Amino acid sequence: MSFRVIIPARLGSSRLPNKPLKDIDGKTLIQRVVDQAKKSNAKSVHVATDSNQIIDHCAQIGVNAILTKVHHHTGTDRLSESCEILKFKSDELIINVQGDEPFIDPKDIDNLAVLADSRAANMVTLYTDLIKDEVVDRNVVKLWIKCQDKVEDFSRNATHLEPSMAKKHLGIYGYKVDFLHTFVEWKQSKNEIDRDLEQMRAMDNGEDIFAIKSSGQYHLGVDTESDLQRAIEIAKKLS
């Protein structure tokens, strides 16, 4: 299954300024994400950013990067613009790897592409098991699987559906390019706004989302200084 990877990266972060350029044991955060993505079977890997500083950094480390608009309503809008800039064909599959996941498992990227192909799906994503502290944490998005990898619903509240069946959603997606362009043309839905979850826009418009369990060992999104310190510890352990 042929696919491409796009990694959104923004400098603006209220909790961790200049996040993509933070050093993690000798490599920047964005460099570590790119390195992992390149270990997948992706046809190409690009960083999509609104920052000339990140563009310059990517040039220094030999990474393909494109400059997008500063203001987008969602990350999916930025992804859609990126596909237009890169002139990707409408039937191509794009895996959206978050720019703050330095230990993303390349197998997860490949497996998402396989899932999208096997289900003929326009939108696919990943999940893993919840740990105790995450059950009540509204910053941790939950999902429920209905059958045959189909997502029943997403919520920040584990009691939204059966709590024992809730899984931790990992914000890594696969989309077909033509679906991306359709998605950004839809108005924000009520559930999207109420839950602050952009994937609800797809579900509220009747689109099925499929998900598989991650095979990765580490699921760390670097959002705070404490996350950064943990990432440094993991990187040292893996070196």
Predicted regions and their residues:
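N-terminal glycine-rich phosphate-binding loop and ensuing alpha1 helix
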Residues: 2-49
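Residues that recognize and position ribonucleotide moieties
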Residues: 14, 95, 102, 173, ...
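Short, high-confidence coil segments that cap the C-terminus of an alpha-helix
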Residues: 42, 90-91, 119-121, 207
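Short phosphate-binding loop-to-helix
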Residues: 46, 52-97, 101-114
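A conserved hydrophobic position in a structured secondary element of the catalytic/binding core
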Residues: 49-50, 104, 175, 223
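Conserved core of the sugar-phosphate nucleotidyltransferase
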Residues: 106-191
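Conserved alpha/beta core of the MobA/IspD/sugar-nucleotide pyrophosphorylase nucleotidyltransferase superfamily
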Residues: 166-239
